[in-house]
Amino acid sequence: PKEVLISVGETLLEAVNKNNINKECILSIGLTNQRETIVFWNKKTLEPLSPAISWQCLRGIDFCNSIVGTKLEAMINKSTGLKVDPYFSFSKIVWALRNLKALFDKKDICVGTIDSWILANIVDGNPHITEITNASRTGLFNTKTETWDIEILDGLEIPISILPKVVKSNHNFGVLSVNILGKKIPINSILGDQQSSLY
């Protein structure tokens, strides 16, 4: 996960320097990311508690197979619009909570998609938030109510307390820490990679 943060900082600097952009002219920045990849970290220290578990990871396949044909599968389909598949974040979260010793006590842990992990580390105040295009690919987000689905969370034994707050994509996500570009810059938009490709 820390490699992702290094890459973000380097990319921002490269974009500014290669294009001779005056940092004082930057009014706002946005963020885009691959959506289903997750990271667990300690809320207080920001230390990662797991490697990034990629959208390509299939470790949740046995769990997914175990709930096919159950009420839980039907709830996930109806509430999220997604099928039960290890591609989506919920299976990775379930697998990690059951298999990674660092997560067993569930104290001070949080989890999020990559946008959430990046924000927690580059924004003043270290917020634990995500936005709808990322949340909607977890298999935990009710797309009708635009909230985490409590019934699904209960069925999967995922505490809502470890999940980020969900906000709109065009939200004031906070201010980029001054130590990254030498200037505090607001982050006012986040979109998943496929949605952002439209722009």
Range-by-range predicted roles:
Residues 1-50, 78, 105, 154, ...:
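N-terminal glycine/serine-rich phosphate-binding loop of ATP-dependent small-molecule kinases
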Residues 5, 9, 61, 192-196:
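Short, well-ordered alpha-helical scaffold segments within catalytic/effector domains
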Residues 9-17, 97, 119, 199:
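Generic structural signal for well-ordered alpha-helical scaffold segments
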Residues 36-41, 139, 196-199:
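Short beta-strand scaffold segments in enzyme catalytic cores
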Residues 45-48, 66-75:
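Hydrophobic or amphipathic alpha-helical targeting/insertion segments
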Residues 53-70:
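Short alpha-helix plus adjacent loop in nuclease-associated cores
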Residues 58, 76-194:
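Gly/Ser/Thr-rich active-site cleft segment
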Residues 62-66, 140-142, 199:
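Short, charged, surface-exposed secondary-structure boundary motifs
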